[in-house]
Structures are given as C-alpha cells and as structure tokens.
Amino acid sequence: MPLFIIITTIILIICSILYFPTIKIKNISVSSYWPISLIGALLLLLTNSIPINLIIDAFTANNSMNPIKILVLFISMTILSIFLDEVGFFRYVANKAIKVLNGSQTKLFIGLYILISFLTVFTSNDIIILTFTPFICYFAKNSKINPIPYLISEFVAANTWSMALIIGNPTNIYLSSAFNIDFIKYLQTMILPTIVASIVSFSILYLLFRKQLKTEINASYNIEEVKIDKGLLIIGLFHLITTTVLIAIASYINIEMWLITLGFSLSLILTTSIYATIKKIKFDIIFKTLKRAPYALIPFVLSMFVIVLTLTNEGITSSISNLLNKTNPVFSFGIGGALIANLINNIPMSVLFANMTFASSASIYASIIASNIAAYITPVGALAGIMWMSLLKTYEINFSFKKFSMYGLIIGIPTLLAALLTLFIII
C-alpha cells in the first residue's frame, strides 16, 4: 500500500507539471503540484503507512535536518531578493546593461550571461529568472530579435551559478544543512565546479546561437527608465549583503543560518514600515513582497519529507543508497541524482538524498551539482523550469517540452559531466 500511494503521487505530480501546472478556482490560480503531494502524504498517514510520532519527531528535531528550519531559511532569503526586485533594482541593472551593450547581439548575449550569473550568486535563481524573462521577451519583441538564445542563456546561467553559494538554491540549503556543511566549506568546494560548468555551458550556448547573434539590434528602441526609491534600495541592499556575510560566518559565531535569515527578513519589514511612515509613502512594497514569497514550497517540501520518511521506513532509501555507493560516488550520485530529479523534481530528490548514507562528502556535493544542473535538462527537473515555461506562454513564445529537453540535453549532459569531473579531481 505505501509504495502504491507513493508511486501514484509521483506520477500525478509529473503529469500535473506537464499537463496542468495550475488549477484555477474562481479568480485564484493555484499550482497543482503541491496539493497532489499533500494528498499523497495525508493518505500515507491515514493508512498508517508511517507512524505519526516519527513525523512529529522529524518536524520538531533540533538539528539541521529539520525541514521547517530549512524552509524558514529559504523563504526568508527569497523575501530579501523579492524586495530588491519590487524596488526595481534588477530591472534598473538590466536597463543599464542594455544601454551599454546595445547594437551588438554578441556583446548583449555575453553581457547578460555575466550579469545574470553574478546576480544569481548573491540572490536566488528563481527570482532572477522571474525578473529577467519578461524583460528579455519585451526587449526582443521591440528590437525585432529572436528571444530564444537569450532566454535559454538566462535559464542556464541562473541554474549553473545557483550552485556557487549555499543560498543560491533551496536544494543547496537542504542538502548542506542536512550534513552540517557551512558556508565557507561549501564555497571552497563548489566554486571551481561552478566555474568549469559555466565555461562549458556558455561555450555550448555560444556555438548553438553564434549565427543568430550576427543580426544587429534595432538601435532606435528606447528603454524605459526605472525609477528607484534610493532609501528603499539602501534598506534592501543592506539587509541582503549583511545577511549573506553573516551566513558566511554563521558556523564561527554559533548562530544557525535560519535564525539569521528570519531575523533580517523581519528587520527588513520593520525598517521598511518605519521608512514608509516617515516618508509618508504607501506600504505596497511590503505587501507585494510578501505576496510573491514561494509559500507553495511549504506544503510541497513537508509532504515530500513525509513521503521520503515512508520510503526510509520501508528500507527503500537505503537500497538506493547502497546501489549508488557501489561505484564511484561522484559520478553515481551526480548522474543518478540528475536522472531522479528529472523524474520527481529536484526538491523531492534532495529530500530523498538527504536521508541516504553517503560513502564520502564527495557524494553530497555531487548530489548538489545534480540538483542544480538537472533544472535545465527537462522542465520536470526544477520548479524554476515549470515557472519559466508557464511565463513564456504568457508572452506568446512557443517553446515546447520537446524543444526544452533537446537544448537541455545538448547543454546539460556535458556541463554535468564537466562539473562532476572537476569535483572528482579536487575532492
């Protein structure tokens, strides 16, 4: 019975991602993947497939594996990034880049890749993708250029450089926290595989699109100026930079990362409220920021955690772990992780792998690499892919599952192997 419920839940989640990503109830659109996972988890509880005390112990545990702490960390960090987006910081930076690079598609292509890579390192891949995709679509339409090279480049850059720092992706946070890997240790290990992966992925991107980039950009297109409240910008940047620095030294000052991010996200709301009161401006930015936070991840991650606990309780997790540990852990966990992520999504894959027994620390880092690069192999690989495909439809850009996977396999497989080989050499 437990296996039947789990397999059915996973199949339905994949089908929802591919065929009905959103459910519309009156005027409210809800992502379909999390209610399915929630129903699956509830069925496991109702059929006594997993003891309730096991779940309570896991959710109240005072350790790094506690999924509630990890969710608080990620959502709090995302709020800091969303705030800067609402202020207009990312659009402002993008506009400045376009003005400097306008005229040459090749320069624009390279410049946007570098800019998106840089911003992703210190914020979140999901936020960067959601911010830059509308901008690229709008600019390409008005400049009469093909948006596909820039959109794919943006998506690849964001999901490659998201593995550079621990804060770049919820999967990084989850796996690192589960095995007590701190900010500095993570950075020391992952920076080189990230750089190599970036060089390989960008080289393939350039080879794929170099002919299309020879067309000149319509230089007469004027970019609309973005007005930014400097006070709000300073507040946002201060909180993001300070949080990142404190996360980097969290293990040395003995403060848990989730407490730092929660404290600064609350401080951001309080400081902004005080500033808005003094300046007599609307509180809209706070409400808009909080409204955009990825709350759907809460039921999804908690439900998948229950499903994985059931698999662990049934002995299936240890069987998969034993199988992957039989060969070289870097390549078995890296390739195996990417395959599993593209079957069940990278967040459930990370929850599953966090419950495994790793033969070495290399296995953990290989799993992190897999969880990031899996995002651009198929749309199923990550929530970012699902959101991105949905966003393209709203801008009437025809980019099918087949086309996504075709580009994803061409770029993703060499990039994954290059990153894993680098990890194998250095670790």
PLM-predicted stretches and their roles:
Residues 1-82, 86, 192-198, 202-313, ...:
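Hydrophobic transmembrane alpha-helices of multi-pass small-molecule transporters
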Residues 7-17, 53-54, 102, 131-147, ...:
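Hydrophobic alpha-helical transmembrane segments
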Residues 77-85, 103-104, 115-125, 157-165, ...:
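Helix-loop-helix module between adjacent transmembrane segments
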Residues 129-130, 179-182, 365, 369, ...:
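Alpha-helical transmembrane segments of multi-pass membrane proteins predominantly involved
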Residues 111, 115, 156, 191-192, ...:
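Hydrophobic residues within alpha-helical transmembrane segments
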Residues 125-132, 152-153, 260-263, 377, ...:
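Hydrophobic alpha-helical membrane segments of integral membrane proteins
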Residues 56-145, 283, 296-360:
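Membrane-embedded alpha-helical segments and adjacent helix-loop junctions characteristic
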Residues 1, 139-212, 216-228, 234, ...:
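Membrane-core helix-loop-helix motifs of multi-pass transport proteins
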